[in-house]
Amino acid sequence: MLFSRSGRSIFPLLPPYAAHAPNPNQGHIITLPPDGLTPYLGLRARLSQVWINRWTILLLLVLVRVLLAASGLQADMSTAKREALSACTSVESMGSSMASMPHYLSQGVNELTASGVEKAVSGLKSMLMLTITGVEELVLFIIKVLYQTYLCLFTLAVRGSVHVAVGVIEEAADFLNSTVKEVGDDIGKAVSTFESAFNKFLDGVNTVASAFGASVPTLDLNSSISALENLQLPSSIDKGLDKLNSSLPTFDEVNNFTQTVLRTPFEEVKKLVNESLGTYTFDRSLLPVPAKEQLTFCEGNNGIDSFFDSVTDLVMTARKIFIAVLIVAATLACVPMAWQEIRRWRSMKERSQLVRKEAHDPMDVVYIVSRPYTAAAGIKAASRFSNSRRQILVRWAVAYATTPAALFVLCLGVAGLLSCLCQYLLLQAVEKTVPELSTQVGAFADKVVDSLQNASAEWANDANGVIGHMNQDLNENVFGWVNTSTTALNDTLNTFVDKTTGVLNDTFGGTLLYEPLMDVFECLIGLKVQGIQKGLTWVHDHAHIDFPLLPNDTFSRGAAASISSNSSNPSDSFLADAGDQTSNKITEVVIRVVNKVEDGVRTETIISAVIILIWVFIALVGIVRALSLFWVRDRNRGEGGGARVNRHESDAGGFIDVPLTAIPNTNTDARSMPTPAPAPAPRYEASTSTVVASRAVPVSSTHHEDEKLGFAGERQYGSALKVDGAADLRGSSYVEYDMEKR
């Protein structure tokens, strides 16, 4: 197309390369100037600047950042070392105070122990007095109930039996007396008749016997009959029962004896308890007071120094490694960059030939030559599409995301992430050494706990000896009397049983009631007394006191528990302050430095990620813009689209229309070229037509509006070198109309 009017260049004029051409109207560019010198850099000049390529510079910047981080970490570790040594001194002082804590706590604990013993003994005294009195009255009540119950049963049984026996005997005696007299009279009459008859018989016998000088005595039964007639039971047959009835025991003697015997040991025990425990006071001077302790584990201990020295050596080693690796990487980066520069130079030389071909957009040619790799990436991505419009959009999106500014943002973000990675590796190496310091500090804590344990065990052993002696004294002076009283009470019960048995033996011994009465006594009283004796025997066997002994870890249990592995909260350790993340102040200093560096690395990582996201956003903007035009139909001339350029027509200023597709032409006359059919989309192909001579075309009023619609133009170098009929330097393809850049 033709511009509406000629313009003036806004850039300095270029060298007149085309002035040496055989045909200045051809527009072909001479490859080299006549003297062989070029204003642009050659291959050797380009290779001389390989060492300042972007990757080497970025790696060197990463190295500088890592060295700064290592120096900062080393300075922080030096500060942490001073703070750790100060904290170690504080821990040493605190450990000495804790190790001396038994000295201060023992006085209060001793007072607490003594007061507890005194209160316990006072309560024991009151309990003993109440128990002794209660047992005394209970035993007396039970015994009184037993023997009075037995007395009632005994009286009921004996008196009832005696009354029944006496009545039966009296009735039997009266019956026998009356019956025996009648029987005696009847027997006397019969015997008198028999005696008369028998005497008559004897008289006859005597008559015969007198002849021989002998005589037979006569039978005389009168005296026996008289005795039989006067026979009767004696009146003293029930005197024994009457005597038994009137002589039943009342056990008053047993009661008085029992009361006296049973109360004696109880009263004696109460008297001894009052005398011994009236105002019991524990001797506090017997309880020990441990001496103060002075711990020293910072002086002469190089654990902390060796830890920080190892950290410093680690940082220095890491610094050397990073210097070596990054410098080698930066140096090695020059090799591929040199090879890339060589390929770029060759590619530029090859693609510079595209300038000679009029079938290409000159701006595209400049882009391909100046940005060979990004242009090649765009062309490769666009090759997946068959539509030329979409190919152009894909290349445009790639070019938008790979501009020098966009790539600078991307490289800056990648370099930042690489720097953060190096710092992270250094930080991880330092964090791995923290357990060594924790082990050293753990040894300090163990020393404090061991000192506390020894002091606590020594104090507990001495205090337990005093408590054991007090237990023995109370068991002998108080519960010894309880044992004595239980033995005496058992003896008293035995005496009561023996005394009662003696009374029953004296009263009913040899009678039919003795066995039943003894069975009733054994059932009613004997078994109960045996139960009481068993209870007294149990009291005798278990009547002793044992005050609890003090554990050996009284003063060290809390400190040992705070540093144990079972503690879930690190700040519970006695070496740490409330809210600390670790179990001691020394490790907390190192952790604080590590957290500080970690926060810095995290911040830098976030910043680098944000920078990369900015590049991603830029790339997305290009992709979204390309996608928005991906399915838009090409507009015709009547719809605001551009007109098809079929001929090369130049104006007086030297501008000609550049076709974007191949225009086959076998004629040399531009005016006689046939108009080709419009293609569906422009393609970047080499034109096979020859360059025709430009001719002046009148400038119409519509040319300026056509130029605004976006027609591409290529300046004809031959005519561009002439200004007012004279040779002139080549001007820029950018023209200015009334101070307006087009």
Curated annotation (Swiss-Prot):
GO biological process, one term: plasma membrane fusion involved in cytogamy
The family this protein is said to belong to: Belongs to the PRM1 family.
Record's protein name: Plasma membrane fusion protein prm1
Membrane spanning stretches: 55-75, 138-158, 321-341, 396-418, 604-624
Cytoplasmic side: 76-137, 342-395, 625-742
Glycosylation site positions: N177, N222, N245, N256, N274, N454, N483, N490, N505, N552, N566
InterPro entries per the UniProt record, alphabetical: PRM1
Gene Ontology CC annotations of this record: mating projection tip; plasma membrane
Coarse class of the protein's main subcellular location: membrane
Keyword Cytoplasm set for record: no
The keyword Transmembrane helix appears for this protein: yes
Membrane topology listed for this record: Multi-pass membrane protein
Purpose of the protein: Involved in cell fusion during mating by stabilizing the plasma membrane fusion event.
Extracellular side: 1-54, 159-320, 419-603
Keywords, in A-Z order: Cell membrane, Conjugation, Glycoprotein, Membrane, Transmembrane, Transmembrane helix
